[in-house]
Amino acid sequence: MIEIKNLKFKYNQDQTSYTLNDVSFHVKRGEWLSIVGHNGSGKSTTARLIGGLLVADSGQIIVDGQELTEETVWDIRDKIGMVFQNPDNQFVGATVEDDVAFGLENKGLPYKEMVSRVQEALSFVGMMDFKDREPARLSGGQKQRVAIAGIIAMRPSILILDEATSMLDPEGRQELIQSIEDIRQQYGMTVLSITHDLDEVAMSNRVLVLKQGKVESISSPRELFSRGSELVDLGLDIPFSALLTQKLKNQGLIDCEGYLTEKELVEQLWEYLSKM
């Protein structure tokens, strides 16, 4: 669905090094790929290049079999929905409902289908009760939900989330991440998320680590979390279940290799307790 080949980019020619230096990777159709790394590693730059908001110095970006060029940028943007960390710049409607409907009106969708999509999108993100509210009167987390709803209603082939859940509380973030996964499954949407959130990473199929503008690794979330203390050097926290698993292993209470999810850890503990 997305193929990146030998991408190089710097914001100005005075930079001594590239922001992205010979980056190559691909995203499969219907896949959820998370991109992680320290601030300044090139994560958001990658998202903006794919969305045609920046122009690479060299390399290729291919979206759905079509190379991104000046001639194709608008066709490719039509396939991509992007949600950024600060959603205020994305609001255009007087009410939440109007804002979510804005893109659909521009596409000329029939009224009944437009109403159906708006209601479905707002329900997905838990904002139906706020449909008549002015976006400016919402909290930061609520604004992010509405911004995501506006993109979901358009049903793009690709959803790019650039720290889009960062302003939500932990419970709200988990609910929204699950909603995005439900949407991905329902519509076969490809998801690319720029994130530091471990729950978001855990939901993805694969994780790409950027380090100083280069691809450090591409792996499954389980393989990444198994790296333990290395995660801190990559700009991530160590999952609670990984810390607890290591402590229990050190005390001889469980016997396992690699990373355990919280569910797997509970199962290991039940197995241990049943033998006491």
Curated annotation (Swiss-Prot):
GO CC annotations, alphabetized: ATP-binding cassette (ABC) transporter complex
Organism: Streptococcus thermophilus (strain ATCC BAA-491 / LMD-9)
Domain of life: Bacteria
Residues reported in the UniProt entry to bind ATP: G37, H38, N39, G40, S41, G42, K43, S44
E.C. numbers: 7.-.-.-
Keyword field contains Oxidoreductase: no
Record GO terms (molecular function): ATP binding; ATP hydrolysis activity; ATPase-coupled transmembrane transporter activity
Leading EC class: translocase
Function: ATP-binding (A) component of a common energy-coupling factor (ECF) ABC-transporter complex. Unlike classic ABC transporters this ECF transporter provides the energy necessary to transport a number of different substrates.
Membrane topology: Peripheral membrane protein
Protease among keywords: no
The name this protein goes by in its record: Energy-coupling factor transporter ATP-binding protein EcfA1
